[in-house]
Amino acid sequence: MGVYTYENEFTSDIPAPKLFKAFVLDADNLIPKIAPQAVKCAEILEGDGGPGTIKKITFGEGSHYGYVKHKIHSIDKENHTYSYSLIEGDALSDNIEKIDYETKLVSAPHGTIIKTTSKYHTKGDVEIKEEHVKAGKEKASHLFKLIEGYLKDHPSEYN
């Protein structure tokens, strides 16, 4: 098994606490509302929403995939960090066992620095193709921009 790690960093002019509430704490409600073509619904299968929780995310009609399951490892509201693994679903190819994600939102003078790390755990000696990672980053970036736009259009929410 190989592990391929990819890091990404980008900025937002939305304050970290507000962004964390929308992007992490209420994503299961907000994303289906603002991007139903991407995510139809999210449901908790086990747990209370904290560490150890298993969620099923059902994708919308605009997606190439049907569903994924996430296992939450940590949510730190004080330090604005979140980690989980994609453990099941058709977004995992035959060559990927799981994908670990870590997100950290860092307060900056004019908003937030968002730092993400993705670790692809492959089966056997399979290598991850750069275009697979790039496509995932583009989808995540598009979804993030939708959330950011929603927060700008609704400044009184998530305070």
Swiss-Prot record:
Domain of life where this protein originates: Eukaryota
GO annotation, biological process: abscisic acid-activated signaling pathway; defense response
Record has Iron as a keyword: no
A Gene Ontology molecular function term of the record: signaling receptor activity
Keyword Phosphoprotein: no
InterPro entries: Bet_v_I/MLP, Bet_v_I_allergen, Plant_def-hormone_signal, START-like_dom_sf
Any one Pfam family match given in the protein's UniProt record, by short name: Bet_v_1
GO cellular component: cytoplasm; nucleus
CDD domains to which the protein is assigned, alphabetical: Bet_v1-like (cd07816)
Cited Gene3D superfamilies: 3.30.530.20
Keywords for the protein's UniProt record, in alphabetical order: Allergen, Pathogenesis-related protein, Plant defense
Subunit structure: Monomer.
Annotated family: Belongs to the BetVI family.
Name assigned to this protein: Major strawberry allergen Fra a 1-C
Gene source species: Fragaria ananassa (Strawberry)
Taxonomic path: Eukaryota, Viridiplantae, Streptophyta, Embryophyta, Tracheophyta
